[in-house]
Structures are given as structure tokens and as C-alpha cells.
Design a protein with these regions (language model features):
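Short, hinge-like loop/turn segments at secondary-structure boundaries
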Residues: 58-62, 93, 131-133
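A short acidic, often aromatic-flanked loop/helix-cap motif at beta-alpha or helix-coil junctions
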Residues: 50, 78-84, 137-143
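Short active-site loop/helix that positions an aromatic residue
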Residues: 21-24, 125
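Short His-Asn-centered micro-motif
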Residues: 13-15, 20, 115-117
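Acidic, PIN/NYN-like endoribonuclease modules and their adjacent C-terminal/linker elements
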Residues: 1-8, 43, 108-114, 118-144
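Active-site neighborhoods of divalent-metal-dependent phosphate/nucleic-acid chemistry enzymes
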Residues: 74-126
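Short, flexible loop segments at the rims of nucleotide/cofactor-binding pockets, characterized by
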Residues: 18-21, 52, 89-93
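PIN/NYN-family metal-dependent endoribonuclease catalytic core
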Residues: 10-13, 23, 29-60, 66-69, ...
Length: 144
């Protein structure tokens, strides 16, 4: 796991994390273990749209996230964030448009990104952005 904690304003959840938490809420155990209980939880429109594109129902995903975390704040990604994301893609070729917009949102909100995507974690590290990269293994379960 990569975690570069510091002062943060909550957590931004990535698409892969939201989908896995929907399927298996136990992976959210880091939330209590790392002392994040009660912090702001953000899900942005990019995450919801990507999940919907993969066949998930946005309302069901949000309902499940609210059951797990309590209040969940849903935000749009601004045009400025999208443009900033495109700039980030040019600097870090492992990013694609969805991830770059999520990363730009995370940077703007000064939150900690929660993901299962190792490449997105590397991009966060490259751009000095707080992140938690979780790993799920068959043998050990969740690695935080």
C-alpha cells in the first residue's frame, strides 16, 4: 500500500474502490483502522459515470456508500479540473482521462484519494497527492 498521509480534508473515492466496496463492504475496514471515521467522503461524477458505464446503478452505489460511510458528498468535476487533468496526463503518461480528472479533483479539494489502482497511486505519488492504495489478495485479503 502507498499512503502519503498528511493534513487532508477527507477522502475521495476512486471508481475501482467504489465498485469493490459495493461488492464487498469489508474492504472499507481501513476507514476505521486508519482513523478516518467521521471525515468527509467525496464521490465525484466521473466515478459514478464510469461505474454506470460498467453496468452499475448509480443510486445503488451511492446508497451502499452512504450505509458504509454515513454522509457522502457527491460533486461535479469542474471544467477547470478537467483541463488541469489533461495537463496532468501530459506530464504523467500512465494517466487516462477519467483518472486524471479524479486526480485533479483530489488535488483541488486537498483530500486523500482511495483507490485499488496501482498506476493511479504512482501518479498520486508523482504529483505529491495524498493517497491510499489498497490491495486485495486471495491469500491475505485486504492489505492496507
Amino acid at each position: 500500500m502507498i499512503d502519503n498521509f498528511g493534513k487532508n480534508n477527507g477522502l475521495t473515492l476512486d471508481t475501482c474502490f467504489v465498485i469493490q466496496a459495493y461488492k464487498n463492504p469489508a474492504i472499507t475496514s481501513f476507514y476505521l483502522q486508519k482513523g478516518f471515521y467521521g471525515c468527509k467522503i467525496f464521490i465525484n461524477e466521473i466515478v459514478l459515470n464510469e461505474a454506470e458505464h460498467l453496468g452499475f446503478d448509480k443510486a445503488k452505489l451511492l446508497f451502499t456508500m452512504q450505509k458504509i460511510f454515513g454522509r457522502v458528498i457527491v460533486k461535479d468535476v469542474t471544467n477547470e479540473e478537467r483541463l488541469f487533468g489533461q495537463h496532468l496526463e501530459k506530464l504523467c503518461p500512465i494517466l487516462h482521462s477519467g483518472d486524471s480528472a479524479i486526480l485533479a479533483f483530489t488535488k483541488r479539494t486537498s483530500t486523500t484519494l482511495v483507490t485499488l489502482d496501482k498506476n493511479l497511486g504512482k501518479a498520486c505519488d508523482f504529483f505529491n497527492t495524498h493517497c491510499i492504495v489498497l490491495e486485495i489478495t486471495k491469500k491475505r485479503g485486504l492489505t492496507v
